[in-house]
């Protein structure tokens, strides 16, 4: 799967090689989108969610859709899973607001499919005090996994892990930071798996 943030969604193709566009946000500036591999996944059902707003959201609206979640059937595992693209409020907001958004996002994923394996990838904008965030997401039944290298290098003060993954019921094997492209954030590659039905 491919999770995007800050994309120009109006220009995204419906097909990207072996990938199909499950859905994208259409009414805001955050440009979330999710592609899935057709040969492995099918029957995508997507939904966008608004999360608690900060001052940045009020001044630079529209930023209402901060979560795009897609439920798909994983043909290899023989079960449904949830994948999500997420974008938290920027550093002008407090960590407490981002924790609130992350918690609300996890609750939204549960509402889509309680008990289903879920993985949420994106720009968490949480480079400092991630140890506290690990404990916070654990209360929701989620694990937090950082990548092997920092994902944002633009500002000396705020360099760090901005982009990472939270998951529930998914074994995350590794998260790698890839070489920088045109974005100011470095992309990450998440490798993981869910158990097959019957295992």
Label each PLM-derived region with a short phrase:
Residues 1, 89-95:
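Second-shell loop/turn segments in exported
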Residues 1-80, 178-179:
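Structured beta-strand-rich core segments of catalytic domains in phosphoester-bond hydrolases
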Residues 1-4, 119-123:
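Short catalytic-loop micro-motif centered on adjacent basic/acidic residues
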Residues 7, 86-88, 122-124, 186:
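Active-site metal-binding loops of divalent metal-dependent hydrolases
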Residues 27, 61-65, 96-104, 157, ...:
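Soluble or luminal CAZymes and related metallo-dependent hydrolases
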Residues 32-34, 67-71, 85, 163-165, ...:
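Conserved hydrophobic/aromatic beta-strand scaffold that supports enzyme active sites
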Residues 69-84, 96-121, 130-135:
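His/acidic metal-ligating clusters that form di-metal
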Residues 109-117, 124-199:
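Metal-dependent phosphoester-hydrolase catalytic domains
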């Amino acid at each position: 799967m491919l999770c995007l943030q800050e994309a120009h969604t109006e220009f995204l193709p419906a097909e990207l090689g072996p990938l199909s566009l499950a859905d994208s946000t259409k009414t805001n500036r955050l440009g979330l989108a999710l592609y899935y591999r057709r040969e492995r996944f099918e029957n995508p059902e997507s939904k966008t969610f608004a999360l608690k707003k900060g001052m940045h959201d009020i001044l630079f609206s529209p930023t209402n859709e901060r979560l795009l979640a897609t439920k798909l059937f994983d043909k290899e595992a023989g079960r449904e899973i949830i994948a999500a693209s997420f974008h938290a409020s920027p550093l002008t907001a407090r960590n407490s607001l981002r924790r609130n958004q992350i918690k609300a996002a996890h609750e939204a994923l549960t509402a889509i499919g309680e008990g289903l394996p879920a993985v949420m990838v994106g720009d968490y904008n949480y480079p400092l005090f991630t140890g506290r965030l690990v404990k916070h997401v654990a209360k929701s039944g989620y694990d937090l996994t950082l990548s092997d290298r920092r994902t944002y290098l633009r500002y000396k003060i705020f360099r760090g892990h901005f982009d990472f993954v939270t998951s529930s019921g998914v074994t995350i094997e590794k998260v790698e930071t890839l070489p920088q492209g045109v974005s100011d954030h470095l992309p990450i590659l998440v490798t993981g798996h869910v158990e097959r039905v019957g295992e």
